Amino acid sequence: MKALMFGWEFPPHILGGLGTASYGLTKGMWECGDMDITFVIPRPHGDEDKHFANIIGASQVPVAWRDVNYDYVDQRIGKVMSPELYFRLRDHIYADFNYMRTNDLGCIEFSGRYPDNLLEEINNYSICAGVIARTIDCDVIHSHDWLTYPAGIHAKQVTGKPLVIHVHATDFDRSRGNVNPTVFAIEKDGMNNADHIITVSNLTRQTVIEKYGIDPAKVTTVHNAVTPLSQELLDIKANKSPKEKVVTFLGRITMQKGPEYFVE
């Protein structure tokens, strides 16, 4: 099976759990066998693990035609994308995007993070998804979290292939009920257009069903797995007194992770 996956982070360059979860799921799918996975991120660094997924950076996807030769492309982006793929993608530019701000290769620059103009980057990412979907053959499209739902929808419209969205969290979780209407609309659009929805917990599944009005038959919970510790880590001995008690909160100090509940 050929899967076209859209994500926003991929190890080792991560800002939260989204990239780690995306990595684990992708690796697990590949280990099942007979899987050909293309994973798209906004901006790769070149040191991503590529042995189980083909990494494509939206920053290297041309959306405006530029007359450049092989050697120049190799010099500019050869560390993260082959010139052959660049030229294949260039052959599938589907509209005139010369009005957009692009670089000398006709590509849109992405921060690869969560900048103030995040909504603009999400829209630009979906434009790149249109070029990728016209170039890369796939059997299923998989979008990780709300940032990539527009890209997944665009790819589905281009290919006619089924779209699965992966809800790692909703804006109700991130904001504790103080929902951003723009984010909510993007999430709802993704859920409505998806052929199936994966949630990371039964609580998130209920939120999707109750808050977004989604048919329960369309939503499946798939819990995140745990990577077994290496023997090197298992061999580490505790450096504390047997009577000493240590309580640890392991997580970002954000509202969503609930450190205040932990302290209370």
Question: Where on the chain are the PLM-derived regions?
Answer:
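Nucleotide-sugar donor-binding and catalytic loop/hinge architecture
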Residues: M1-K2, L229-V246
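Active-site proximal beta-strand in glycosyltransferases
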Residues: A3, V140-H142, Y149, I153-R174, ...
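A short, glycine/small-residue-rich beta-strand->loop->alpha-helix junction that serves as a flexible
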Residues: E9-A21, D47-K50, K257
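A conserved catalytic-core segment of Leloir-type glycosyltransferases
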Residues: C32-A133
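Nucleotide-sugar donor phosphate/pyrophosphate-binding loop at the beta->alpha transition
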Residues: L118-C128, K161-V164, F172-D189, P228
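Membrane-proximal helix-turn-helix segments that form the acceptor-binding/catalytic region
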Residues: G130-T135, Q157, N180-I197
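Conserved donor-binding/catalytic core segment of Leloir-type glycosyltransferases
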Residues: I198, N239-V263
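Carbohydrate-associated surface elements
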Residues: L203, A225
